[in-house]
């Protein structure tokens, strides 16, 4: 489930923000769209984002697994993860470096999902 695409859609974001605080925008979408066995991927540089924390709570209510990507130890986000969840923390102080590594992790995850769904394919020289 991709919440980010929905949060960058200005009409969805405006509607959610008008109804309730922005901090619960992702949690509302997880509750509406998430199911047991789904995986929620969240990312927060320092783990202090209330929106992310509430989405994790909503995912756990739905018996979903959460993959949390963060830096600075993950803060409250990391503390809200369960033993069955996955936490990837970038041990660096500079936000720019943390974001660069988290983007690399996201690309690696996408590649792994592609390999699982489509099988290993050799790239040809262009």
Regions found by a protein language model. Give the residues of each.
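Glycine-rich phosphate-binding loops that contact phosphosugars or nucleotide phosphates
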Residues: 4-123
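N-terminal loops that bind phosphate or other acidic moieties
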Residues: 126
